[in-house]
Amino acid sequence: MTRLPILLLLISLVYATPFPQTSKKIGDDATLSCNRNNTNDYVVMSAWYKEPNSIILLAAKSDVLYFDNYTKDKISYDSPYDDLVTTITIKSLTARDAGTYVCAFFMTSPTNDTDKVDYEEYSTELIVNTDSESTIDIILSGSTHSPETSSEKPDYIDNSNCSSVFEIATPEPITDNVEDHTDTVTYTSDSINTVSASSGESTTDETPEPITDKEEDHTVTDTVSYTTVSTSSGIVTTKSTTDDADLYDTYNDNDTVPSTTVGGSTTSISNYKTKDFVEIFGITALIILSAVAIFCITYYIYNKRSRKYKTENKV
């Protein structure tokens, strides 16, 4: 008896011959039954399962045990006629209930004292239809439904009496008066802001000449500046010319603006370059290094004399 559940799990027989089919609609109840051929042996246990490997129930006489979430409310079991027939009723069919159901009989001979168990199984296919007409009936009858076609042609419409008039409007020419804007820039040498200063203030008026740019050729022009110094002793005007190219030279150019004489005094304006700062830094570093060298030499001489003096005192 302990080996019967193991034998049930090893059931995998598949028949090539077609088996009965039952077709029902969704919501109906389906009753599936099977009869055993061996009526002489004693039925030990009967079983129902759904392929591929879903066990529904195991029954021994009036005792029924359900598996895989199946309940008696969904599937009822009956075995009339002294276990010659086993029947199940599936209630309220759904699409998931469709499939192949297998009933099995486990039998033993009442005259045989051995533990030999005979086995029989039968399959039934349950088809659940979603429409009122059975799918099996459609396949067996060979009927096909083709869309209806209409051979009627629409009435011919005579368009000879119809005319369409299209009015095409010709737009008037659009005149776009474009004003010619001319920008005139007048440079006069007389436009000089004069600062009357008896205090010695100076006014610088620069009148740059136009720079011509044609076909990516840049022409660098000179800038003429006038420096006017007004003092109580007189007015001195100095003209200086600066080339734009000189603005990019930071090492080799050492320009000095000519001195301006005001009332007998001379003032010199110098432009310091990077080179000048480098020279100053070099001279300063040289002085510091010289001072360090002198300090080291002095310390060495003093230390040597101190050691010599200590040695003489010990002796």
From Swiss-Prot:
Glycosylated residues (UniProt): N37, N69, N112, N161, N254
Swiss-Prot/TrEMBL induction comment: Expressed in the early phase of the viral replicative cycle.
Disordered: annotated span: 191-213
GO cellular component, one term: virion membrane
InterPro entries: Ig-like_dom, Ig-like_dom_sf, Ig-like_fold, Ig_sub, Ig_V-set
Stretches of the chain found on the membrane's Intravirion side: 304-315
Post-translation changes: Glycosylated; contains phosphate and sulfate-substituted glycans. O-glycosylation is required for hemagglutination and hemadsorption activities of infected cell membranes.
Topological domains, Virion surface: 17-279
Segments traversing the membrane: 280-303
Record's keyword terms, sorted: Disulfide bond, Early protein, Glycoprotein, Hemagglutinin, Host membrane, Immunoglobulin domain, Late protein, Membrane, Signal, Transmembrane, Transmembrane helix, Viral envelope protein, Virion
Membrane topology summary: Single-pass type I membrane protein
Cleaved signal peptide residues: 1-16
Biased composition, class Polar residues, residue ranges: 191-202
Domain Ig-like V-type: 17-121
Subcellular location: Virion membrane; Host membrane
Pfam families: V-set (PF07686)
Disulfide pattern: C34-C103
Subunit description: Heterodimerizes with OPG040. The heterodimer OPG185-OPG040 interacts with components of the entry fusion complex OPG143 and OPG094. Heterodimer with C3/VPC protein; disulfide-linked.
Function: Prevents cell to cell fusion by interacting with and directing the viral OPG040 protein on the host plasma membrane. The OPG185-OPG040 complex associates with components of the entry fusion complex (EFC) presumably to avoid superinfection and syncytium formation. Via its interaction with C3/VCP protein, protects the infected cell and probably also the extracellular enveloped virus from complement attack.
Family: Belongs to the orthopoxvirus OPG185 family.
Protein name per its UniProtKB record: Protein OPG185
Lineage, opening ranks: Viruses, Varidnaviria, Bamfordvirae, Nucleocytoviricota, Pokkesviricetes
Gene name of the record: OPG185
